């Protein structure tokens, strides 16, 4: 008789399972005999140990495995018969009351996948972002490259300006007490690069060699040095050297220094434009995809299996700990990481994954081989040997699967943009690139 699956609440289900003791013992004896053919028992030749002795040494482990296997098979038959898709693993609880001596009974509690309804795409409001790349962006990038290759020349009597390198001594106190990291001598940095806190750079601006200044500085609340975060220090700086940054001319020598073998400045600019356009395209795609996915998640109203959310949380915690280890953080495995910190985002990820999967199935948006190859070739342009990168990705199943997942998401985004209410929005170049 087919077991009856009960609905508890939401996606949670329950079913009672039973296996006969006789079936368990029959399988246990069969496995003991198989083990006995090769088992090495002291005092006996291989295969000659008494079954009773094998029962004592191997019986408990074999019996445990057999019961798990038979109960698992009964569970699969029950959910298959009810045509259910199980999310995660069931929780099994032994039953004793009202159970015959010749039967082992269990209650399996589990979750099922929800019925996912793709929202009406025509009702979704999404944003498609765009950033034009002009000569101004190319020239701006050229300026950045020139500043990175600046040569600094000491200028006597020069008041420091943005772009100058200053060498100074500094000492800071909090409530009159020195603190760790608050003092240095012959400390160099370039004004305007954002390496130092804004108040510190502002204090050093306009000073000449030999001049000093005393000023207050409030550390941000989220400052990396937790012992001083949110506190106000008093700093004294003394400038010892001011060096002006002399930028290289944009000429053949400069072009060659950036890998343009011919020293052709116009070809260098064309290469820079190509690289900028590639980076801009990737960032715009990311922003637009974010808008599309946010709209899908917001419109997708259905329960998600807690088992899948918990699994995602565990994966993200493991990844976070691994990242801490890579950064050299001591005792990374014992750093507190409460599950609730990750649960909201994990629920969103699970919901989005179910929605995308259903949308791909309904609209037949699977990644095509030619799309995957085109995306790999595009990605390979970031490397010096693109052809080798393409061959590597095509030959490696795992790497290829990663690109297939990206292409699949691209197809989903394109499909939503074709059907949703789309608002086009220009993003300033500096903002897109995180320079503003």
Curated annotation (Swiss-Prot):
InterPro entries: PPIase_dom_sf, PPIase_FKBP_dom, Trig_fac, Trigger_fac_C, Trigger_fac_C_sf, Trigger_fac_ribosome-bd_bac, Trigger_fac_ribosome-bd_sf, Trigger_fact/SurA_dom_sf. One of its GO terms (cellular component) is cytoplasm. Its EC number is 5.2.1.8. SUPFAM superfamilies: FKBP-like, Triger factor/SurA peptide-binding domain-like, Trigger factor ribosome-binding domain. Keywords: Cell cycle, Cell division, Chaperone, Cytoplasm, Isomerase, Rotamase. It catalyses: [protein]-peptidylproline (omega=180) = [protein]-peptidylproline (omega=0). GO terms for biological process: 'de novo' cotranslational protein folding; cell division; chaperone-mediated protein folding; protein transport; protein unfolding. It is found in: Cytoplasm. GO terms for molecular function: peptidyl-prolyl cis-trans isomerase activity; protein folding chaperone; ribosome binding. It comes from the Bacteria. Residues 163-248 form the PPIase FKBP-type domain. Involved in protein export. Acts as a chaperone by maintaining the newly synthesized protein in an open conformation. Functions as a peptidyl-prolyl cis-trans isomerase. Belongs to the FKBP-type PPIase family. Tig subfamily. HAMAP family: Trigger_factor_Tig. Consists of 3 domains; the N-terminus binds the ribosome, the middle domain has PPIase activity, while the C-terminus has intrinsic chaperone activity on its own. This is Trigger factor. It comes from Bordetella parapertussis (strain 12822 / ATCC BAA-587 / NCTC 13253).
């Amino acid at each position: 008789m087919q077991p009856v699956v009960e609905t508890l609440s939401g996606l949670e289900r329950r079913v009672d399972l039973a296996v006969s003791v006789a079936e368990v013992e029959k399988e246990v004896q069969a496995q003991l005999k198989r083990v006995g053919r090769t088992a090495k028992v002291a005092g006996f030749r291989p295969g000659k140990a008494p079954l009773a002795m094998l029962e004592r040494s191997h019986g408990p482990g074999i019996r445990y495995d057999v019961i798990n296997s038979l109960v698992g098979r009964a569970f699969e038959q029950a959910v298959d018969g009810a045509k259910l898709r199980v999310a995660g693993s069931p929780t099994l609880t032994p039953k004793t009351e009202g159970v015959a001596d010749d039967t082992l009974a269990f209650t399996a509690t589990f979750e099922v996948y929800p019925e996912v309804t793709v929202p009406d795409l025509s009702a979704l409001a999404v944003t498609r972002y765009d950033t034009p790349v002009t000569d101004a962006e190319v020239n701006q990038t050229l300026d950045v490259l020139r500043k990175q290759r600046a040569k600094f020349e000491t200028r006597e009597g020069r008041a420091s300006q943005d772009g100058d390198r200053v060498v100074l001594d500094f000492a800071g106190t909090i409530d009159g007490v020195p603190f760790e990291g608050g003092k240095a001598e012959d400390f160099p940095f370039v004004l305007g690069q954002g390496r130092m806190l804004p108040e510190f750079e502002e204090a050093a601006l306009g000073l000449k060699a030999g001049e000093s200044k005393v000023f207050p500085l409030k550390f941000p609340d989220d400052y990396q040095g937790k012992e001083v975060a949110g506190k106000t220090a008093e700093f004294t700086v003394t400038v010892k050297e001011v060096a002006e940054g002399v930028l290289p001319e944009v000429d053949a020598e400069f072009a060659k220094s950036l890998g343009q073998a011919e020293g052709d400045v116009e070809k260098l600019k064309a290469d820079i434009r190509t690289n900028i356009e590639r980076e801009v395209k990737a960032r715009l795609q990311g922003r637009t995809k974010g808008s599309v996915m946010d709209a899908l998640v917001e419109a997708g109203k259905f329960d998600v299996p807690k088992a899948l959310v918990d699994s995602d949380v565990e994966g993200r915690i493991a990844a976070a700990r691994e990242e801490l280890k890579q950064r050299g953080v001591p005792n990374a495995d014992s750093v507190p990481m409460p599950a609730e910190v990750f649960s909201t985002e994990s629920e969103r990820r699970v919901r989005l994954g179910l929605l995308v999967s259903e949308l791909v199935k309904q609209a037949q948006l699977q990644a095509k081989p030619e799309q995957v190859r085109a995306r790999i070739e595009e990605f390979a342009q970031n490397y010096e040997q693109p052809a080798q990168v393409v061959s590597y990705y095509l030959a490696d199943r795992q790497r290829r699967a990663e690109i297939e997942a990206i292409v699949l998401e691209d197809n989903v985004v394109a499909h939503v943009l074709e059907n949703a209410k789309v608002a086009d929005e220009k993003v300033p170049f500096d903002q897109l690139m995180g320079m503003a």
